Amino acid sequence: MLFAWAPFPALLGLADSCCFVVPRSEWKALPSECSKGLKKPVRYVVISHTAGSFCSSPDSCEQQARNVQLYQMKQLGWCDVAYNFLIGEDGHVYEGRGWTIKGDHTGPIWNPMSIGITFMGDYSHRVPAKRALRAALNLLKCGVSEGFLRSNYEVKGHRDVQSTLSPGDQLYEIIQSWDHYRE
């Protein structure tokens, strides 16, 4: 059922998109209560990890995305899952708030001017699956081609902009090698 959304990319603001994004409806997200938009194109991308459980199949990643959203909405009282996108080790990108809604991933200074991409899992002591890294890089490339990200966008690690261990030592080392990474 993962491909059932393919005829409806316009519903995600992804008409003629090069991105493979699992829509909220596919992972059975709760309705968002967020409405504050992001000014496009966005200059910054903040990479984090959830520091929670890993997922490696569409079913387990959909469940993990729901778990993250439930915690952030019900326990923390946020209007939705904090991130614009979530990356699973199944190699899929899961729509959080998407390209157009401000996230709650990095605090009041960075949220209004960045896209938050989180890798589901804890990457302190292990690297993400290659297919997860490819999915994230493809999402960034598509963000530029679709006009959501500036062509000269900058990638930051969560720890570069906030006092945290996120995105974990192993993932942080990897993103530092990405072309758009800036400390």
Swiss-Prot record:
<dbReference type="GO" id="GO:0009253">
    <property type="term" value="P:peptidoglycan catabolic process"/>
</dbReference>
<dbReference type="GO" id="GO:0042742">
    <property type="term" value="P:defense response to bacterium"/>
</dbReference>
<dbReference type="GO" id="GO:0016045">
    <property type="term" value="P:detection of bacterium"/>
</dbReference>
<dbReference type="GO" id="GO:0045187">
    <property type="term" value="P:regulation of circadian sleep/wake cycle, sleep"/>
</dbReference>
<feature type="signal peptide">
    <location>
        <begin position="1"/>
        <end position="17"/>
    </location>
</feature>
<dbReference type="GO" id="GO:0008270">
    <property type="term" value="F:zinc ion binding"/>
</dbReference>
<feature type="domain" description="N-acetylmuramoyl-L-alanine amidase">
    <location>
        <begin position="40"/>
        <end position="168"/>
    </location>
</feature>
<dbReference type="GO" id="GO:0009617">
    <property type="term" value="P:response to bacterium"/>
</dbReference>
<dbReference type="GO" id="GO:0016019">
    <property type="term" value="F:peptidoglycan immune receptor activity"/>
</dbReference>
<keyword id="KW-0391">Immunity</keyword>
<dbReference type="GO" id="GO:0006955">
    <property type="term" value="P:immune response"/>
</dbReference>
<feature type="disulfide bond">
    <location>
        <begin position="55"/>
        <end position="61"/>
    </location>
</feature>
<dbReference type="InterPro" id="IPR006619">
    <property type="entry name" value="PGRP_domain_met/bac"/>
</dbReference>
<dbReference type="Pfam" id="PF01510">
    <property type="entry name" value="Amidase_2"/>
</dbReference>
<dbReference type="GO" id="GO:0005615">
    <property type="term" value="C:extracellular space"/>
</dbReference>
<keyword id="KW-0929">Antimicrobial</keyword>
<dbReference type="GO" id="GO:0051701">
    <property type="term" value="P:biological process involved in interaction with host"/>
</dbReference>
<protein>
    <recommendedName>
        <fullName>Peptidoglycan recognition protein 1</fullName>
    </recommendedName>
</protein>
<dbReference type="GO" id="GO:0008745">
    <property type="term" value="F:N-acetylmuramoyl-L-alanine amidase activity"/>
</dbReference>
<comment type="function">
    <text>Innate immunity protein that plays several important functions in antimicrobial and antitumor defense systems. Acts as a pattern receptor that binds to murein peptidoglycans (PGN) of Gram-positive bacteria and thus provides bactericidal activity. Forms an equimolar complex with heat shock protein HSPA1A and induces programmed cell death through apoptosis and necroptosis in tumor cell lines by activating the TNFR1 receptor on the target cell membrane. In addition, acts in complex with the Ca(2+)-binding protein S100A4 as a chemoattractant able to induce lymphocyte movement.</text>
</comment>
<dbReference type="InterPro" id="IPR015510">
    <property type="entry name" value="PGRP"/>
</dbReference>
<dbReference type="GO" id="GO:0045087">
    <property type="term" value="P:innate immune response"/>
</dbReference>
<dbReference type="GO" id="GO:0032827">
    <property type="term" value="P:negative regulation of natural killer cell differentiation involved in immune response"/>
</dbReference>
<dbReference type="InterPro" id="IPR036505">
    <property type="entry name" value="Amidase/PGRP_sf"/>
</dbReference>
<feature type="disulfide bond">
    <location>
        <begin position="18"/>
        <end position="142"/>
    </location>
</feature>
<dbReference type="GO" id="GO:0030544">
    <property type="term" value="F:Hsp70 protein binding"/>
</dbReference>
<dbReference type="GO" id="GO:0032689">
    <property type="term" value="P:negative regulation of type II interferon production"/>
</dbReference>
<comment type="similarity">
    <text>Belongs to the N-acetylmuramoyl-L-alanine amidase 2 family.</text>
</comment>
<feature type="disulfide bond">
    <location>
        <begin position="34"/>
        <end position="79"/>
    </location>
</feature>
<dbReference type="InterPro" id="IPR002502">
    <property type="entry name" value="Amidase_domain"/>
</dbReference>
<dbReference type="GO" id="GO:0050830">
    <property type="term" value="P:defense response to Gram-positive bacterium"/>
</dbReference>
<keyword id="KW-0399">Innate immunity</keyword>
<keyword id="KW-0732">Signal</keyword>
<keyword id="KW-1015">Disulfide bond</keyword>
<dbReference type="GO" id="GO:0061844">
    <property type="term" value="P:antimicrobial humoral immune response mediated by antimicrobial peptide"/>
</dbReference>
<dbReference type="InterPro" id="IPR017331">
    <property type="entry name" value="Peptidoglycan_recognition"/>
</dbReference>
<dbReference type="GO" id="GO:0060090">
    <property type="term" value="F:molecular adaptor activity"/>
</dbReference>
<dbReference type="GO" id="GO:0050728">
    <property type="term" value="P:negative regulation of inflammatory response"/>
</dbReference>
<dbReference type="GO" id="GO:0048018">
    <property type="term" value="F:receptor ligand activity"/>
</dbReference>
<keyword id="KW-0044">Antibiotic</keyword>
<keyword id="KW-0964">Secreted</keyword>
<dbReference type="GO" id="GO:0042834">
    <property type="term" value="F:peptidoglycan binding"/>
</dbReference>
